[in-house]
């Protein structure tokens, strides 16, 4: 009798060992996995604007700014940040190493090309530009404005990052939608010292392009004691073009007659 029991157990164990477990095709499964390397609050802001995966899939951004002296068209390679700004009287470019200026006529460019070549791109590409390497995030007090409270995230840079590592930004967002609403920023390019005054831009007019929620209008505000006061001016953006194809690299090279900016 014991022999029969032992034989039955052996057959049972062998059957279990030979049993095949069906493979699961995880490509067809929806997995709840958190992979963000960013703080939760800024991750939610990115998500409210279409998500970093969608942004990172794009290689080219072009936008037009409507200005009093004529349209200004900016094209940027999103992967290497080479850029080209076409203005009525001038062209500014960045080839990855040097900033250059080309005059189209006798009009003198009165700005600073090295300061300006990526300035409006940074403002326009918010909040995604705040996912760059070398950034430090910190929660700060909410901005109280006209009866509304906007949670804040302070952005600073590690030493040696960019032309102005002393720059600081504060992104304020809607606590319900997590969409960006305000940007506070300092300007340190000229002084090379940490700024004490925050300037303010309001982001409250959006448009969806290729699945990404991008600004349609930026509104600058006057400021006092590091707070926005009254509206100063609007700057509309039109003809937004996002592409998964890289722009022609030759367009960023300095043409004949251009001046390299030191």
Task: State each model region's role.
Residues 2-7:
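Sec-dependent signal peptide recognition
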Residues 12-15:
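C-terminal motif of bacterial Sec signal peptides marking the signal peptidase cleavage site
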Residues 17-19:
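Bacterial signal peptide processing site
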Residues 25-27, 33, 37-108, 141:
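N-terminal mature ectodomain segment of secretory-pathway/periplasmic proteins
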Residues 48, 136-141, 201-203:
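Short structured motifs
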Residues 57-64, 78-85, 146-154, 180-182, ...:
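Short, hydrophobic/aromatic-rich segments at coil-to-beta transitions
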Residues 101-167, 191-194, 251-261:
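Flexible, processing/modification-adjacent segments and terminal tails
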Residues 151-252:
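Gly/Pro-enriched, hydrophobic low-complexity segments
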């Amino acid at each position: 009798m014991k022999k029969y029991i032992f034989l039955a157990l052996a057959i049972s164990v062998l059957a279990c060992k030979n049993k095949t477990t069906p493979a699961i095709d995880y490509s067809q499964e929806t997995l709840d996995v958190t992979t963000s390397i960013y703080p939760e609050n800024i991750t939610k802001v990115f998500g409210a604007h279409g998500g970093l995966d969608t942004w990172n899939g794009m290689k080219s951004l072009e936008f037009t700014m409507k200005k009093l002296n004529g349209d200004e068209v900016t094209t940027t390679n999103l992967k290497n940040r080479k850029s080209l700004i076409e203005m009525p009287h001038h062209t500014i470019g960045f080839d990855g190493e040097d900033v250059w200026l080309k005059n189209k006529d006798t009009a003198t460019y009165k700005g600073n090309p090295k300061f300006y070549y990526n300035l409006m791109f940074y403002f326009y590409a918010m909040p995604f530009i705040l996912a760059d390497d070398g950034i430090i995030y910190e929660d700060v007090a909410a901005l109280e404005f006209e009866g509304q409270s906007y949670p804040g995230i302070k952005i600073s840079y590690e030493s040696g990052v960019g032309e102005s590592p002393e720059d600081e930004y504060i992104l304020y967002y809607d606590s319900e939608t997590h969409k960006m609403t305000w940007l506070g920023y300092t300007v340190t390019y000229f002084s090379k010292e940490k700024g004490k005054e925050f300037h303010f831009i309001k982001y409250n007019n959006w448009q969806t392009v290729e699945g990404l929620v991008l600004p349609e209008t930026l509104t600058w505000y006057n400021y006092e004691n590091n707070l926005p006061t009254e509206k100063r001016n609007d700057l509309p953006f039109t003809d937004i073009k996002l592409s998964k194809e890289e722009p022609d690299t030759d367009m960023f090279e300095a043409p004949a007659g251009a001046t390299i900016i030191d």
